[in-house]
C-alpha cells in the first residue's frame, strides 16, 4: 500500500508536466498524423496522468489506482521519470529515497 500511496502522490503532484524534447530520426506516423524527421516533440505527461480512460477517478487522490487484488501494480502510463533512452538517470535512486523518506515520516506519527 505504501508504494501505491507514493505513486498516487507522484501522479497527482505531476512535478514535470512535459517530457524532454525528442525528435524522430525518420518520418513517422503516429495515430494517423505524420511527424516529419527532426520535428521536436514532447509528451504531455499531465494528459497521461489524468487520462479518464486509464484512471478510474483521475482528479481524486486514490491509491487504489495502483492496487489490484490488494497488491501493488504499476501502470504503463505512469511515467513521471519519462521512458526510453532519455529517462531520468536518477530514477532508481529517487524512488528509493522517496520510499525511505515517506516511511520514515510515517514512523514519526
List the predicted regions and their residue ranges.
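Conserved cytochrome P450 K-helix E-x-x-R motif and the immediately C-terminal K′/meander segment
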Residues: 1-32
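Conserved cytochrome P450 K-helix/beta-meander segment immediately N-terminal to the heme-binding cysteine loop
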Residues: 13, 27, 43-71
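Conserved, non-catalytic sequence blocks in retroelement Pol enzymes and Pol-derived host proteins
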Residues: 32, 88-92
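Active-site-adjacent bridging/hinge elements
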Residues: 69-79
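Cytochrome P450 heme-binding "Cys pocket" and the immediately downstream C-terminal segment
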Residues: 74, 92-109
